Amino acid sequence: MSLKNLPSESMPREKLLQRGPQSLSDAELLAIFLRTGTQGMNVIELADFLLRDFGSLRKLFSADEQSFCRHKGLGQAKYVQLQAVLEMTQRYLAETLQRGDALTSPQHTKLYLSSMLRDRHREAFYVLFLDNQNRVIKDEVMFEGTIDAASVYPREVVKRALHYNAAALILAHNHPSGVAEPSQADRRITRRLSDALGLVDIRVLDHFVVGDGEVVSFAERGWI
């Protein structure tokens, strides 16, 4: 059963228009994306089944093509559509950061870094290079693998920061375990980078650690 054939009181599109998207459940939002159900399940029932099967909306959205398309009611076209939506979301967050002050929109910064890092299966060390107005000049993954003192090279970070004529940096990396709590090694790396960058008058404004559903800020902890 499609959305248009649902009883009016059960139609998530109408609910969204009347009450706003925040009033919808995860299943209702997913139903709008799916548009139609399958034999034996209307679209709301299908959405609810998929959320239970994957475990969460985030796990559904981060599924690879094979895992996504093995479900009845989903296919390559839906997978492509979903990837386009996710990419547009990342670009929106990136544009918001690039046009504004990264420090005055910390929630956008967290959302953007989370979207870039949380679903990686390997650790990745990410850097936002900022100008003297704290606007993002460039952002990129600098190191991948096990993020420790042996794999993060302060000299390379300094070199890259000078290349972009950056005045400040925001650092970030993910914990594939899902636990965002920073380790002692994370704190040591941050101090080494801050010291090295300080020699060329470049500040480290924050270091975010991205986990599963949580992002920890060193600045908020008073560690920077």
UniProtKB/Swiss-Prot annotation:
The keyword Protease applies. It comes from the Bacteria. Zn(2+) binds at H173, H175, D186. Keywords: Hydrolase, Metal-binding, Metalloprotease, Protease, Zinc. Residues 1-20 are annotated as: Disordered. GO terms for biological process: proteolysis. This is UPF0758 protein VV0285. The lineage of its organism: Bacteria, Pseudomonadati, Pseudomonadota, Gammaproteobacteria, Vibrionales.
